[in-house]
UniProtKB/Swiss-Prot annotation:
This is 5'-nucleotidase SurE. Keywords: Cytoplasm, Hydrolase, Metal-binding, Nucleotide-binding. InterPro entries: SurE, SurE-like_Pase/nucleotidase, SurE-like_sf. It comes from Salinibacter ruber (strain DSM 13855 / M31). Binds 1 divalent metal cation per subunit.
Length: 272
């Protein structure tokens, strides 16, 4: 998409999956202060790992929130739904005009490799891309004691690039920042998603009423030692920037499946 017209202040929508009161989105808003007109629309509660879920059987409500950045208060709404709900509601109902850019984050914890599919943070940015908007997701690769300042600095830099140059239609950026000081970060790397999976199981437990319940547990397994992957970049101290898209067609597989005996006019038993 094209960047905002010269002289126009860009409209930037912020979202996340950690919830509107999470420190990551507050740090993001503060870091982007002054780059344009900021709006925050985010879930009222934590929505980690909800993926691209949307609410279809319950009402979705929005209420105004107090949200401050160094220059003063900015418009903000808490939404009783998922990250994707929040972006949909913002663009269709809450904002008086579409944003020029949607930024989701800063997530507490990485969103690399297969975890992109589970991530509510990435899904908020993906929903924006589906709506035809430029978007990016940004995550800090630290769970326990996150320090968002450096990630915010990189968010600002990459947002400036995105506003200046625009993104290809249907493509968003998935950004992961290593948990290092500004001086320790080696730079930025354009990467691809690493192939990975989870070795999972469920822990069977019993509640006080002696009823069983199950708790998901697992170990992350990296199946890809390529130096150009997001996991490799983070390990080497680089900010990882991965272009991704919601078109999940396996275009490279068309040649392989072209050898199958396709007959568009045949029935399931092969008859005409």
């Amino acid at each position: 998409m094209s960047s905002p017209a010269s002289g126009d202040e860009p409209r930037i929508l912020l979202c996340n999956d950690d919830g509107i009161h999470a420190p990551g989105i507050q740090s993001l808003a503060s870091a982007l202060d002054g780059l344009g007109e900021l709006f925050v629309v985010a879930p009222t509660t934590e929505q980690s790992a909800v993926g691209h879920a949307i609410t279809v059987r319950d009402p979705v409500r929005a209420h105004r929130e107090e949200f401050e950045v160094p220059s003063g208060p900015i418009p903000a709404w808490g939404v009783t739904g998922t990250p994707a709900d929040s972006v949909k509601l913002a663009c269709h109902e809450l904002l008086d005009a579409p944003p020029d850019l949607v930024v989701s984050g800063i997530n507490q914890g990485p969103n690399t490799a297969v975890n992109v599919l589970y991530s509510g943070t990435v899904s908020a940015a993906t929903e924006a891309s589906i709506l035809g908007l430029d978007s990016l997701a940004i995550s800090l690769c630290e769970w326990s004691k996150p320090q968002f300042e450096v990630a915010g600095q990189w968010a600002r830099r990459i947002v400036e690039w995105a506003l200046d140059r625009g993104l290809p239609q249907g493509v968003l950026l998935n950004v992961n920042v290593p948990a290092l000081s500004a001086e320790q970060i080696e730079g930025v790397a354009l990467t691809r998603q690493a192939r990975s999976r989870w070795e999972e199981g469920f822990e069977r437990r019993t509640d006080p009423a002696d009823r069983p319940y199950y708790w998901l547990a697992g170990t992350f397994v990296n199946l890809d030692d390529g130096p150009e992957t997001d996991l490799s970049a983070i390990e080497r101290g680089y900010v990882s920037v991965t272009p991704i898209q919601h078109d999940m067609t396996a275009h490279d597989a068309f040649e392989a499946f072209g050898t199958w005996d396709w007959d568009e006019s045949a029935g399931p038993d092969g008859s005409e």
